[in-house]
């Protein structure tokens, strides 16, 4: 009798690998893990695994093996997503090299209408949706979205789709119009895009998820006198004589509050 232990568990123990156990990470733990993975640490060594496990334990029970297998599975998902993106890019390149995309019925249309913005609008929106929330790829003409910090959690892309579709529709409606109307339309699209951006973002301060405003923040009013903010890499964030940071914090990054020595 093996006392209820499976052969896989014995094999993992014999190979020196961590023993897998069932674990359902909490949302706070997922945020921390995704932030670390997207920062470039995709295969942490043993000492880093222990450090990450201690950080996660603030939000619930977790073992070193859970952290090890989470990164293993996350790397597999990332490679699978990368292959899907490469296949989509190859298909798009093949369609572009073969000329205008085939339509359901292009007969009866005058030459030049088959490739009009109306027929390309669907392809543009589909492409933007396919590229959303990828930590390894970004849409060239748009700023990064919140979803890019969350890996497989598909929160990003909505603002990009809306901006792209409104730009296409403006081109269709204003074809042949004056340059002043085109400039006004572009200004309106920019206002629409920035109005969709949240006023706050989530960072980790001393391991706790914290909502902070975008842009430079006032350290003294938020955290008190004689405090400094240090990035998880050990770099001190510069502030002026009034305690206001010179640069904005970065979404999903980890920081630590340090008391200034007198």
From Swiss-Prot:
What is this protein's tissue specificity according to the annotation? Expressed in crown roots. Expressed in the shoot apical meristem (SAM), leaf primordia, and young leaves.
List the InterPro entries.
HD, Homeodomain-like_sf, WOX11-like
Q: Where is the composition biased (Low complexity)?
A: 84-112
Q: Which UniProt keywords apply?
A: Developmental protein, DNA-binding, Homeobox, Nucleus, Transcription, Transcription regulation
Q: Where in the cell is it found?
A: Nucleus
Q: Where is the composition biased (Basic and acidic residues)?
A: 1-11
Q: What does this protein do?
A: Transcription factor involved in crown root development. Promotes the development of crown roots (both initiation and elongation), main components of the fibrous root system. Regulates the expression of genes required for crown root development, and hormone-responsive genes involved in cytokinin signaling (e.g. RR1, RR2, RR3 and RR4), and auxin signaling (e.g. IAA5, IAA11, IAA23 and IAA31). Functions dowstream of the auxin biosynthetic genes YUCCA1 in the promotion of crown root development.
Record-given protein name:
WUSCHEL-related homeobox 11
Q: Which organism is it from?
A: Oryza sativa subsp. japonica
């Amino acid at each position: 009798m093996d006392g209820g232990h499976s052969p896989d568990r014995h094999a993992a123990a014999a190979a020196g690998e961590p023993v897998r156990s069932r674990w359902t990470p909490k949302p706070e733990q997922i945020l921390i893990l995704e932030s670390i993975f997207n920062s470039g640490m995709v295969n942490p060594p043993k000492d880093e695994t222990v450090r990450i496990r201690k950080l996660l334990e603030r939000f619930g029970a977790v073992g070193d093996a859970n952290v090890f297998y989470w990164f293993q599975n996350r790397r597999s998902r990332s490679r699978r997503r990368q292959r899907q993106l490469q296949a989509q890019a190859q298909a798009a390149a093949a369609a572009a090299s073969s000329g205008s995309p085939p339509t359901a019925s292009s007969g009866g249309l005058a030459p030049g209408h088959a490739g009009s913005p109306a027929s390309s609008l669907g392809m543009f929106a589909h492409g933007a949706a396919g590229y959303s929330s990828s930590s390894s790829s970004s849409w060239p003409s748009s700023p990064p979205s919140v979803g890019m910090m969350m890996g497989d959690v598909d929160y990003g892309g909505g603002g990009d789709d809306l901006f792209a579709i409104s730009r296409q529709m403006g081109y269709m409606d204003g074809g042949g119009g004056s340059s002043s109307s085109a400039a006004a339309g572009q200004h309106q699209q920019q206002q629409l895009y920035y109005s969709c951006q949240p006023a706050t973002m989530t960072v980790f301060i001393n391991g706790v998820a914290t909502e902070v405003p975008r842009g430079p923040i006032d350290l003294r009013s938020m955290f008190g006198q004689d405090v400094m903010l240090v990035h998880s890499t050990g770099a001190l964030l510069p502030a002026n004589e009034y305690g206001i940071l010179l640069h904005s914090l970065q979404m999903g990054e980890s920081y630590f509050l340090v008391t200034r020595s007198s």
